[in-house]
């Protein structure tokens, strides 16, 4: 069972008020500090203490003493929390990022070429918007030397506010660029890749959730490069199964939609408009709408899920015949996002890969830096697509 140690120390936010001697002077008469100590326990009252320091003081010993006094008054656990963001945000100092998650800053000639190509064609990528840790590897070409990126269509602004995601949000984002499908197709064709992942923000402000625009992008790519394999990582379209049909029959090769986390944590992790059953319905319908369609999903680990809960989610996914599962470590984009509860070891990820394939998934990509649009297993997926296509012709 996964375990999380709560923080045992309070944290403090300090606001400073100043009073000048007169408008010609740059010296301050005094500094007024208000120290806010917040407990992660919602039943515990906030404590505030004021401290005044004279302008002549040369050190912060009085302030340190006051902080120590406040700290001494707190004995209950502090599990994390940012003001106004709830008790599940903030950095947990007891959960340190391990060495296996440290990545070099992305750089290189090929990386810059991809970046400039995307900028020139006004295209968005989930690589940048979601702060993907694998951006350097993918844009530089990885092991096969072929650079690729995961294109994000329907703009760069999401109508939802999932608590794990770094993509910017708005209730009324700008309308989709009508030239985006064609520009995307041109960019991908120029890269020379034979497998591409397209994803999108959620667009609850559009009647079909953006499925029509998404489908146009797929069709444009197939026109420019008929032999390219396209994986679409989609939203849930608010559970609109007709929207799912539109995309499934657009010419894509892999239909992907992420359940993100186990059933118990859905409401904590995802926007209220998303949900476990709704995501399962979308994945199930993609298979029904087009028999033989390869389906894929992803789950983040390290959010506080238990082994039994993860096994239950994996069983539910196999019950609707999902083919591919990716498992990766949740990484907190900013202190305002959900706190990492645990850094799962590479050995445990190996265990989940073996377990997933033992219960019937055709492929499981499992590792700390694996993401739903990651290249891991790309060759295997290509083989699956070709096999599925051959069966449909026979």
From Swiss-Prot:
Transit peptide (residue range): 1-36
Broad class of enzyme this protein falls into: transferase
Protein residues bound to [4Fe-4S] cluster 2: 158, 162, 165
GO molecular function: 4 iron, 4 sulfur cluster binding; lipoate synthase activity; metal ion binding
Family matches, as InterPro entries: Aldolase_TIM, Elp3/MiaA/NifB-like_rSAM, LIAS_N, Lipoyl_synth, Lipoyl_synth_chlpt, rSAM
Major localization class: plastid
SMART domains: Elp3 (SM00729)
Keyword 4Fe-4S annotated: yes
PROSITE patterns: RADICAL_SAM
Catalytic activity: [[Fe-S] cluster scaffold protein carrying a second [4Fe-4S](2+) cluster] + N(6)-octanoyl-L-lysyl-[protein] + 2 oxidized [2Fe-2S]-[ferredoxin] + 2 S-adenosyl-L-methionine + 4 H(+) = [[Fe-S] cluster scaffold protein] + N(6)-[(R)-dihydrolipoyl]-L-lysyl-[protein] + 4 Fe(3+) + 2 hydrogen sulfide + 2 5'-deoxyadenosine + 2 L-methionine + 2 reduced [2Fe-2S]-[ferredoxin]
Positions contributing to [4Fe-4S] cluster 1 binding: 127, 132, 138, 373
Keyword Metal-binding listed: yes
One Gene Ontology CC term in the entry: chloroplast
NCBIfam families: lipA, PRK05481.1, PRK12928.1
Similarity comment: family membership: Belongs to the radical SAM superfamily. Lipoyl synthase family.
Record's protein name: Lipoyl synthase, chloroplastic
Native organism: Arabidopsis thaliana (Mouse-ear cress)
